[in-house]
């Protein structure tokens, strides 16, 4: 792969992702052996010249959406998180014990109304979106070959019974402390991806959601090789997060940037927005990183489905034309910002 990339005059310096096994996250008996394997992989990447490794510490659910093709007025579609649909999935499909305690009376009432009219096909589509399509190609826990993805998903959730935020934090500290010597030896920067969306889901602890969480893991293992993947899209989906302010605060500990934006609705729903719009304020974010951490790897993240992308079978969020449009937008932003800073 390295030779193939370099044959086009490019340099392979970032890997996204080197997945962290669930047993490392929940602290299973095989944790130490799995961490040793991880250290070997890190060393091999470092020897190959890869100096930036993105990963996440999200239990079970890497990222959550309820719709993969929510329509825009211009005919394109993008990813969407409908909170009531997610409540319905949790309470009526997953049937998670105690789920109702996590939601408001209004959300539960709306989910109950949805239960009266939803069709079997709509239920299957919701399962396919939340469990299979968004999870299967990310970490391999679930695939389209699973005959009963809901039961498999319940088994994965059960692994975290009794695991709260403090326990997951300590497991993250344990993991990072173990791999930092390898990072130091081979000059590899580890950068954790924020939880997507940055809120608690399905009773699982989520520990990279906001300013306080970021400060915690950076201070817990205070090593320059322990850093952040600054995903503007994930962070902007949390109304608690001022994305440019976080960029200013954590620019020096950011090793990788994802350029994506969202619009958050008053009811808590969010939709992936145009790269030049939404609450992430990507123009200002690019300006901050170009000024405070020049040379940090940045990439356009996700894109709308448009202009025939619909029939190509692309993974959710990774359409060709939509991503090329986002890339062109961000390329223009970077050119203007660099001229501005060099003036």
Descriptions of predicted regions:
Residues 6, 23-27, 32-53, 61-66, ...:
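Histidine-acidic metal/acid-base catalytic patches
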């Amino acid at each position: 792969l390295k030779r193939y990339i370099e044959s086009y005059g490019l340099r392979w310096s970032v890997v996204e992702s080197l997945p962290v096994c669930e047993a490392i996250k929940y602290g299973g008996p095989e944790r130490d052996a799995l961490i040793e394997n991880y250290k070997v992989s890190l060393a091999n990447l470092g020897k190959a010249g890869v100096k930036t490794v993105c990963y996440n510490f999200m239990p079970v659910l890497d990222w959550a959406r309820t719709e993969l093709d929510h329509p825009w007025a211009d005919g394109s579609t993008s990813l969407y998180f409908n909170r009531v649909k997610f409540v319905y999935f949790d309470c009526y499909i997953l049937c998670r014990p105690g789920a109702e305690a996590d939601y408001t009376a209004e959300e539960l009432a709306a989910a109950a109304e949805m239960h009266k009219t939803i069709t079997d096909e709509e239920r299957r589509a919701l399962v396919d979106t939340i469990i299979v399509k968004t999870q299967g190609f990310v970490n391999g826990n679930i695939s389209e070959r699973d005959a009963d993805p809901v039961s498999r998903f319940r088994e994965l959730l059960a692994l975290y019974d009794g695991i709260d935020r403090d326990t997951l934090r300590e497991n993250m500290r344990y993991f990072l402390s173990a791999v930092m010597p390898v990072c130091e030896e081979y000059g590899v920067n580890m950068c954790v991806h924020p939880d997507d969306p940055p809120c608690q889901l399905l009773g699982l602890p989520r520990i990279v959601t906001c300013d306080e969480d970021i400060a915690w893991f950076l201070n817990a293992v205070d090593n320059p090789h322990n850093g952040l993947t600054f995903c503007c899209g994930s962070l902007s989906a949390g109304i608690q997060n001022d994305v440019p302010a976080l960029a200013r605060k954590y620019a020096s500990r950011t090793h990788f940037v994802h350029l994506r934006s969202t619009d958050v609705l008053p009811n808590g729903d969010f939709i992936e927005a145009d790269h030049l719009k939404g609450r992430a304020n990507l123009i200002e974010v690019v300006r901050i990183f170009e000024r405070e951490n020049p040379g940090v790897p940045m990439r356009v993240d996700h894109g709308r489905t448009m202009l025939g992308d619909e029939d190509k079978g692309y993974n959710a969020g990774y359409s060709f034309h939509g991503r090329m449009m986002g890339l062109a937008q961000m390329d223009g932003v970077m050119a203007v910002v660099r001229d501005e800073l060099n003036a």
